[in-house]
């Protein structure tokens, strides 16, 4: 951030995460209390505070709290819920669900890129020194729903449920601010993404999905 302090950069987009909300029963907007339940989320909050604290008349940061990403990308991720379930449908011919009632806001990776472009092209007075949840209200899903969508999209993959290892993260997020300011509406859907991932796996393009390159925890001890 040294170059920022010298005034070389006017606008920075910071990729944060909706997991800063941790747990919450209500629809959570950008003003909702933060309740991180992982080191990953705590470090994101600390980084948000640092970069937003640098905002002034000459430097305008924008914090983007991203939903959980999904979909095919050149550097594929198989440690994200939709991608994991799609991959397991191919390798195990079943989907494993732990708990299932937890809410999670989802966002296609191409839609995420679209939001970055929109923020860079927007009037700085509109997006500077602002925090945005990035996603769409209609892609807030419970994990059970995600499994059902993917299982049906891939031809009736069976679902196995396990209540012994529950994920503490459970949050449903409002994206009204983003839609109102930038007119963002997602184009990607979970079922289309699952089919595209399966096609890539079947073609052999991705090789062995167990390769370390597909999992961030091999490179960073912070929880994803």
Where are these regions (language model features)?
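Hydrophobic alpha-helix immediately C-terminal to the catalytic Tyr-X-X-X-Lys motif of short-chain
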Residues: 46, 50, 54, 85, ...
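Conserved sequence/active-site signature of Rossmann-fold short-chain dehydrogenase/reductase
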Residues: 20, 69-71, 112, 139
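C-terminal substrate-binding subdomain of Rossmann-fold SDR/epimerase-dehydratase oxidoreductases
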Residues: 93, 97-101, 105-224
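Short-chain dehydrogenase/reductase
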Residues: 32, 37-45, 75-80, 105-106, ...
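Conserved Rossmann-fold NAD(P)-dependent oxidoreductase catalytic core, especially the SDR/UDP-sugar
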Residues: 1-39
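Conserved SDR Rossmann-fold cofactor-binding beta-strand/turn motif
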Residues: 16, 65-66, 70
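Active-site Tyr-X1-5-Lys
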Residues: 23, 35-65, 90-91
